[in-house]
């Protein structure tokens, strides 16, 4: 009897469950990766290509993420494959994993005496952007992580360290950057609790005492090699500097924004440019590395005045900081500047003019200064007027190439960055010395470089402090020279291990310290040399004969 209503038989193979196919896909990708190691091929691994190929093969609804691939790699291969796979290798190309954290939202301290916040400043408790900190919108990656963690420092730090670890980065050395308004204007109890939790997040200690937390952090496997605190000149007095030294802070980021007194007054900064110069000098004489924030394209400035102020910044010894963040002015809703823009009293530079300006600024940068950032992390849809492109530094460097100029700042020349972007390795490395006068003191910038390829491997900043601004008893009791920074670049190499292809832990740091000691003794006439050291690096200096001296590591010479 014939069957009715039945179609022709199909050979369609029934698919295995999604989870099973997902595991099989990860296994196949891992097999290809391990095969590339054992076969000895030197070709680059195209991980995205492999993920697309096998996701198609197994008809997956969702592709595996990098963390899924890393988790499926056998332990014996991880050591060799992780450096090739890590997401955003620039994150640790400078030799340190930077972890940004935010303090709780609070009002700007200068409202009390100026009556309002700066005209360009978004965010804060009274802004359109609820639950965001001062000068942030709440939509930057760091802000969103902070909001998810309800501004709990422990949760923020732990979460970010784990995230970097999952993405294949070495988190052996961590530097905290403390953002979110003027941290030093918050109550002392809150500040100390915040810092304790940051140290505890690395060491696993759960006490509340700051000195104890720092002792445990010193011995932790994940070392805190430095803390950066954002502040203002009026919250950078000797008392504030002493507190920050106690926290383990090694670098200050000071908001300057403009070198013109009239612009500082009109934008409602709440401090003078003269106070900025004094802050730089006192901070450097206390051993800190100093980075400042500058904003081109502010109201009533114009292109010529902008270029002039950056020339002044790099040439005038009263400024000349170790680092700089260039933040072109952005018009964001809810700010005083937005009202000026809306009524036609403020107009931003065109995109082309801004690229031109940044290119001209970068051409002025001396080789001892590091340009940390060239624009804010604020998402483009929130920007009403200002920067149109998310890759301003890249565009400016391309413009410089067209104009026949080069950027010789520290970041552009770092060996790790050169490796990531240009696959360039140094050949002949030699010690180079540059001396300059800044903020009342004699600065010596020592570095190991390949002068032919213009690649920087390591640097040391040595200072003979000024008599006028030195106030710390560790420095006034006898003639002292200060090492404000020692940094060997190249991708992070875990402490206690060596990788002959990387530049960390190859002895460059020790050689730089030996030369600094010689200069301090023979040229400065110092009896002692002190280092401002991150909590987790104190043991390194201990091996070089240094002893704890207040918050510093010191040695008689």
Curated annotation (Swiss-Prot):
Substitution effect: residue 168 to R: Impaired tRNA wobble uridine modification
Classification via InterPro entries: Acyl_CoA_acyltransferase (IPR016181), ELP3 (IPR039661), ELP3-like (IPR034687), ELP3-like_N (IPR056591), Elp3/MiaA/NifB-like_rSAM (IPR006638), GNAT_dom (IPR000182), Radical_SAM_C (IPR032432), rSAM (IPR007197)
Listed cofactors: [4Fe-4S] cluster
Keywords on record: 4Fe-4S, Acyltransferase, Cytoplasm, Iron, Iron-sulfur, Isopeptide bond, Metal-binding, Nucleus, Repeat, RNA-binding, S-adenosyl-L-methionine, Transferase, tRNA processing, tRNA-binding, Ubl conjugation
EC number of the protein: 2.3.1.311
Result when mutating residue 108 to S: Eliminates iron contents
Annotated phenotype, changing residue 65 to A: Does not affect tRNA modification
Gene3D superfamilies the record matches: 3.40.630.30
Covalent cross-link Glycyl lysine isopeptide (Lys-Gly) (interchain with G-Cter in ubiquitin) as placed by the record, residue numbers: 453
Impact upon substituting residue 118 to A: Dissociation of the elongator complex following assembly. Loss of elongator complex activity
Pathway: tRNA modification; 5-methoxycarbonylmethyl-2-thiouridine-tRNA biosynthesis
Enzyme class: transferase
Ranges where the Radical SAM core domain occurs: 91-381
Cofactor note: Binds 1 [4Fe-4S] cluster. The cluster is coordinated with 3 cysteines and an exchangeable S-adenosyl-L-methionine. The cluster is required for structural integrity of the elongator complex, while it is not required for catalytic activity.
Outcome of substituting residue 251 to A: Abolished tRNA modification
Matches recorded under SUPFAM superfamilies: Acyl-CoA N-acyltransferases (Nat) (SSF55729), Radical SAM enzymes (SSF102114)
Variant or mutagenesis effect after changing residue 341 to A: Decreased tRNA modification
GO molecular function annotations of the record: 4 iron, 4 sulfur cluster binding; metal ion binding; tRNA binding; tRNA uridine(34) acetyltransferase activity
Location of this chain's protein in the cell: Cytoplasm; Nucleus
Family, as annotated: Belongs to the ELP3 family.
Function: Catalytic tRNA acetyltransferase subunit of the elongator complex which is required for multiple tRNA modifications, including mcm5U (5-methoxycarbonylmethyl uridine), mcm5s2U (5-methoxycarbonylmethyl-2-thiouridine), and ncm5U (5-carbamoylmethyl uridine). In the elongator complex, acts as a tRNA uridine(34) acetyltransferase, which mediates formation of carboxymethyluridine in the wobble base at position 34 in tRNAs. The complex functions as a gamma-toxin target (TOT); disruption of the complex confers resistance to Kluyveromyces lactis toxin zymocin (pGKL1 killer toxin).
Oligomer status and interactors: Component of the elongator complex which consists of ELP1/IKI3, ELP2, ELP3, ELP4, ELP5/IKI1 and ELP6. The elongator complex is composed of two copies of the Elp123 subcomplex (composed of ELP1/IKI3, ELP2 and ELP3) and two copies of the Elp456 subcomplex (composed of ELP4, ELP5/IKI1 and ELP6). The Elp123 subcomplex forms a two-lobed scaffold, which binds the Elp456 subcomplex asymmetrically. In each lobe, ELP2 is tightly sandwiched between ELP1/IKI3 and ELP3. The Elp123 subcomplex binds tRNA through ELP1/IKI3 and ELP3 and can bind 2 tRNAs simultaneously.
The protein, known as: Elongator complex protein 3
Native organism: Saccharomyces cerevisiae (strain ATCC 204508 / S288c)
Underlying gene: ELP3
